[in-house]
């Protein structure tokens, strides 16, 4: 049953027929006379499509005729959808007509209308209009199907609209704009109350829980969706935009998926009859005023992307074959637009990724270039500084020695006191040159990880007294007060670390402080303990250091650029070497200074893990841990080094055999079958001997110990993979050699 407010007539009619209906409305008002008025006109411009660049928009002629009588109201509307055709509707519903008058702001019509239609005594206006309508339709042969000329015109209009949709797809990459404009244009063309795009979303497959000890079965992925685009004939039509599906109600719709995937267009002329078995679905559609619908699929890459749905509200509608074909073609072209948009999005994504990679790669290249430039600058700075630091003592040595040589050929000899002065100067500069070279070598070994600590227990007070005594002469000569502030009790005086390295650290810091402090100044060495750490603090009353120069103070060959640098005559590596030695102990060094306020260097050294040992204790431990096979083969060309190793190991109760080189070494090892081999030589020869040892079944368990002057981490990694078990750097440290031999001999057989 039709709602009370539904139009009684809605058809596509030729423009000529619509004009005849308008004239009939006027004629009926004139013929009826008393109290009957007819208002005819165009709708205000606000009802026409807004101007814009869209190729889908066109001017719409929207006209009306309102017949007002005491007994009945009648509204005729016609909306031009093509040059020769109108979408026509007729209604007698009072509520619709009142809303129409109020919406169109027609005060003249409102004043002429009675508050309530009177009950007519004779034939009603509706009856007369119905009879006249049938007469006009029959005379024009319009009946319930369009005449051939109308069909041809509709087909031409469909082709034109399709061309416009295709043109916009080609012109625009904005999918939202394409879909919005297409929905609006198709809604107007089909003269439907609502046209929507229902877009599907697919959830991931899930597992159906089963009984215990059963394998869960995969559940097919579920599809759901929402209305993403919409066009309505008027605001009175409820919106469905953003409406999500209700799976229970739409189960019947989902059964059409296979049909939709084949491109079928589904037409439902009356939902109440078509879905009579589904009360839920009918109730849902009626909630949004849907009475008839036409559905076309949008298939993208073999998947049902969405549905293009036309809704006719309030009354049934018989869908024409041309309308079905047209909506199906629109769905196909929209699918093309979606594929085009997806491809464009993928291209944009690839483009953005490529641009990101280009930016990252450019940054990497820029960073690499800057690092190379910095390294080149540092190398140049290193060469300049080291050449200057080495050239200064060399110049003095060469100059003074040349002077002495010239005096040997001179008739008058150089006074002995002068000769002694020159020779002492040469000796002093030679020692300075040697110290600089040793510092550079030591720093290089520290940075490459080739330096090991020789930790032992010693007296901190004795160390402090030794360092102060060695620099006391320099302090007196420069008229500087050198003080020791020792804050450790006698019972806590012992400390475990590398005594030689600590002596070097303190000497370097004190020597710099003396050079940094002017006459009548003070330099203090302060020592105390905190927990398992020893703190060494060197404080002076010199000119201080600018805050900007502190970050580069511990970097090798960095030029600070002021008078502070001139005091450090250590080849540019003094403080850098000090910092490396401190960090080798696992400690750290800090500096506090400001111009004119002096400088404080604070060094923190943690107690090392090596226990205090004596020569007798080492011997006792070696005796206790001596393995059954105590024979050792030493392969060493240097007689002095070989003699030292043999004497150390012999005292430790090892049986030592000395081989000069690796020639026939494999045969000797197989014959003697030692527990340990200490080998020194070319890496190629050493690896060749080691390979033969590890391949031999009789001696494959023998431990191989390598001696080398220097060894990088990469070289050691390569050598260890070829069978070498451990290494020790030269010059040899006897205590460390015995500890390494003991640790290797205590390891379980491999």
From Swiss-Prot:
It catalyses: ATP + protein L-histidine = ADP + protein N-phospho-L-histidine. SUPFAM superfamilies: ATPase domain of HSP90 chaperone/DNA topoisomerase II/histidine kinase, CheY-like, GAF domain-like, Homodimeric domain of signal transducing histidine kinase. The modification Phosphohistidine is found at residue 388. It comes from the Bacteria. Residues 631-745 form the Response regulatory domain. One of its GO terms (molecular function) is phosphorelay sensor kinase activity. Homodimer. Part of the circadian clock (KaiA, KaiB, KaiC, CikA, RpaA, SasA), the composition of which varies during the circadian cycle. KaiA and CikA compete for binding to KaiB(fs). Interacts with RpaA. The N-terminal domain is followed by a GAF (phytochrome-like) domain that lacks the conserved Cys residue for ligand binding, a histidine kinase domain and a C-terminal response regulator domain (pseudo-receiver domain, PsR). Residues 385-609 form the Histidine kinase domain. Functions in an input pathway to the Kai circadian clock. Senses oxidized quinones via its C-terminal pseudo-receiver domain, providing a link between cell metabolism and the clock. Affects the ratio of phosphorylated to unphosphorylated KaiC, binds quinones via its pseudo-receptor domain. Quinone-binding destabilizes the protein rapidly. Autophosphorylates, does not transfer the phosphate to its pseudo-receiver (PsR) domain. May play a role in cell division. This is Circadian input-output histidine kinase CikA. Its EC number is 2.7.13.3. The modification 4-aspartylphosphate is found at residue 680. Residues 1-173 are annotated as: N-terminal domain. InterPro entries: CheY-like_superfamily, GAF, GAF-like_dom_sf, HATPase_C_sf, His_kinase_dom, HisK_dim/P_dom, HisK_dim/P_sf, Phyto_chromo_attachment. In the N-terminal section; belongs to the phytochrome family. Pfam families: GAF, HATPase_c, HisKA, Response_reg. It is an enzyme of class 2 (transferase). The keyword Cell cycle applies. Keywords: ATP-binding, Biological rhythms, Cell cycle, Cell division, Kinase, Nucleotide-binding, Phosphoprotein, Transferase, Two-component regulatory system. One of its GO terms (biological process) is cell division. Residues 174-333 are annotated as: GAF domain. The keyword Transferase applies. Residues 604-750 are annotated as: PsR domain, bind KaiB(fs).
């Amino acid at each position: 049953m039709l709602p009370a407010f539904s139009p009684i007539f809605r058809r596509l009619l030729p423009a000529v027929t619509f004009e005849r209906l308008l004239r009939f409305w006027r004629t009926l008002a004139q013929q009826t006379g008393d109290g009957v008025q007819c208002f005819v006109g165009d709708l205000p411009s606000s009802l026409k499509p807004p101007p814009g660049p869209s190729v889908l928009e066109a001017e719409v002629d929207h006209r009306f005729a309102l017949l007002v009588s005491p007994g009945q109201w009648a509204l005729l509307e016609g909306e031009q959808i093509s040059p020769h055709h109108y979408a026509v509707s007729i209604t007698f519903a009072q509520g619709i007509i009142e809303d129409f008058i109020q919406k169109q702001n027609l005060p003249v019509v409102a004043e002429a209308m009675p508050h309530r239609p009177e009950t007519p005594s004779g034939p009603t206006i509706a009856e007369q209009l119905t009879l006249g309508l049938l007469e006009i339709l029959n005379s024009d042969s319009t009946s319930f199907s369009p005449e051939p000329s109308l069909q041809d015109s509709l087909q031409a209009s469909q082709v034109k609209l399709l061309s416009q949709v295709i043109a916009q797809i080609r012109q625009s990459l904005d999918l939202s704009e394409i879909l919005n404009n297409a929905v609006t244009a198709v809604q107007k063309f089909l003269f439907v109350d609502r046209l929507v795009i229902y877009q599907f979303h697919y959830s991931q497959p899930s597992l159906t829980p089963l009984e215990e000890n059963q394998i869960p079965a995969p559940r097919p992925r579920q599809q759901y969706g929402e209305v993403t685009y919409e066009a309505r004939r008027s605001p009175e039509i409820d919106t469905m935009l953003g409406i999500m599906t209700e799976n229970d109600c739409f189960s019947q719709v989902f059964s059409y998926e296979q049909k939709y995937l084949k491109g079928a267009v589904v037409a439902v002329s009356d939902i109440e009859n078509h879905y009579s078995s589904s009360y839920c679905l009918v109730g849902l559609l009626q909630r949004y005023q849907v009475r008839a619908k036409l559905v076309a699929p949008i298939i993208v890459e073999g998947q049902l992307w969405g549905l293009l749905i036309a809704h006719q509200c309030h009354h049934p509608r018989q869908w024409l074959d041309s309308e079905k074909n047209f909506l199906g073609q629109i769905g196909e072209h929209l699918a093309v637009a979606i594929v085009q948009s997806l491809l464009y999005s993928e291209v944009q994504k690839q483009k953005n990724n490529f641009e990101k990679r280009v930016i990252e790669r450019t940054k990497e290249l820029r960073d690499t270039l800057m690092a190379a430039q910095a390294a080149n600058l540092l190398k140049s700075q290193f060469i300049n500084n080291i050449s200057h630091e080495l050239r200064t003592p060399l110049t003095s040595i060469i100059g003074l020695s040349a002077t002495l040589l010239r005096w040997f050929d001179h008739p008058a000899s150089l006074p002995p006191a002068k000769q002694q002065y020159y020779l002492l100067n040469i000796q002093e500069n030679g020692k300075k040159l040697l110290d600089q070279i040793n510092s550079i070598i030591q720093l290089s070994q520290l940075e490459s990880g080739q330096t090991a600590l020789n930790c032992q227990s010693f007296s901190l007070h004795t160390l402090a007294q030794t360092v102060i005594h060695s620099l006391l002469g320099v302090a007196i000569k420069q008229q500087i007060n050198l003080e020791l502030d020792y804050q450790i009790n006698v019972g806590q005086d012992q400390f475990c670390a590398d005594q030689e390295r600590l002596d070097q650290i303190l000497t370097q810091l004190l020597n710099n402080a003396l050079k940094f402090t002017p006459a009548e100044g003070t330099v203090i060495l302060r020592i105390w303990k905190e927990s398992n750490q020893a703190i060494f603090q060197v404080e002076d009353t010199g000119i201080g250091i600018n805050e900007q120069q502190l970050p580069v103070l511990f970097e090798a060959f960095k030029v600070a650029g002021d008078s502070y640098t001139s005091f450090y005559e250590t080849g540019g590596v003094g403080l850098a070497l000090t910092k490396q030695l401190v960090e080798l102990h696992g400690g750290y060094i800090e500096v506090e200074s400001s111009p004119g306020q002096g400088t404080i260097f604070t060094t923190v050294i943690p107690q090392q893990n090596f226990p205090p040992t004596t020569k007798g204790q080492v011997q006792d431990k070696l005796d206790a841990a001596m393995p059954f096979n105590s024979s050792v083969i030493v392969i060493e060309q240097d007689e002095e080094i070989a003699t030292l190793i043999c004497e150390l190991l012999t005292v430790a109760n090892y049986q030592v055999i000395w081989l000069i080189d690796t020639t026939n070494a494999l045969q000797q090892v197989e014959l003697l079958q030692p527990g340990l081999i200490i080998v020194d030589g070319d890496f190629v020869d050493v690896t060749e001997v080691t390979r033969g040892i590890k391949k031999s079944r009789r001696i494959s368990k023998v431990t191989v110990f390598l001696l080398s002057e220097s060894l990088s981490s990469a070289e050691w990694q390569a050598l260890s993979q070829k069978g070498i078990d451990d290494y020790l750097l030269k010059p040899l440290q006897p205590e460390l050699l015995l500890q390494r031999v003991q640790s290797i001999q205590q390891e379980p057989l491999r």
